[in-house]
Amino acid sequence: MEAPPVTMMPVTGGTINMMEYLLQGSVLDHSLESLIHRLRGLCDNMEPETFLDHEMVFLLKGQQASPFVLRARRSMDRAGAPWHLRYLGQPEMGDKNRHALVRNCVDIATSENLTDFLMEMGFRMDHEFVAKGHLFRKGIMKVVVYKIFRILVPGNTDSTEALSLSYLVELSVVAPAGQDMVSDDMRNFAEQLKPLVHLEKIDPKRLM
């Protein structure tokens, strides 16, 4: 969807290690409009963006116990928009004083032959889905509210059905490593969304 924001830190002999700080929750369909109204009041004074994306998750199995995972995403409603390749590292859950999940994040725009390239590299597609929703911004924070649709016929994004009767809500910041104070701002913002949605530091391993 989005490339990491540009930082003002000088790059000296290498790339900046970017981290994603994340809080997650969900709302039932009937609460969506109330949440959208609240976010319009709390977020930056600009019209929220809408998105309709097709995401494919690729795995590469090797010597390690768990496969290497890459995510390829393209916009379905913006002609000519580049594909995006995303890598998300293992979450750092240990620090109880940190109010958000933290994981390494690499997000780059690519050419449209991305999926062919991944297959040539030995990756295989594990699953795919369509995500449709709204994107809000509050300073460097990003809030996405979206519904996931399963693809009924592999590769056919016109044949989908909703995965659940709820919308996922994600509050995130992409920043250089060591900027843990952003999790305090995220927690304060999340408090303002209660009781409509409870955004939490969720360990993905608990969902498996």
UniProtKB/Swiss-Prot annotation:
It is found in: Nucleus. Keywords: Activator, Nucleus, Phosphoprotein, Transcription, Transcription regulation. The modification Phosphoserine is found at residue 66. The keyword Transcription applies. One of its GO terms (cellular component) is core mediator complex. Pfam families: Med18. Its main location: nucleus. GO terms for biological process: positive regulation of transcription elongation by RNA polymerase II; positive regulation of transcription initiation by RNA polymerase II; RNA polymerase II preinitiation complex assembly. The keyword Transcription applies. InterPro entries: Mediator_Med18 (IPR019095). One of its GO terms (molecular function) is transcription coregulator activity. Belongs to the Mediator complex subunit 18 family. PANTHER family: MEDIATOR OF RNA POLYMERASE II TRANSCRIPTION SUBUNIT 18, MEDIATOR OF RNA POLYMERASE II TRANSCRIPTION, SUBUNIT 18. Component of the Mediator complex, a coactivator involved in the regulated transcription of nearly all RNA polymerase II-dependent genes. Mediator functions as a bridge to convey information from gene-specific regulatory proteins to the basal RNA polymerase II transcription machinery. Mediator is recruited to promoters by direct interactions with regulatory proteins and serves as a scaffold for the assembly of a functional preinitiation complex with RNA polymerase II and the general transcription factors. Component of the Mediator complex, which is composed of MED1, MED4, MED6, MED7, MED8, MED9, MED10, MED11, MED12, MED13, MED13L, MED14, MED15, MED16, MED17, MED18, MED19, MED20, MED21, MED22, MED23, MED24, MED25, MED26, MED27, MED29, MED30, MED31, CCNC, CDK8 and CDC2L6/CDK11. The MED12, MED13, CCNC and CDK8 subunits form a distinct module termed the CDK8 module. Mediator containing the CDK8 module is less active than Mediator lacking this module in supporting transcriptional activation. This is Mediator of RNA polymerase II transcription subunit 18.
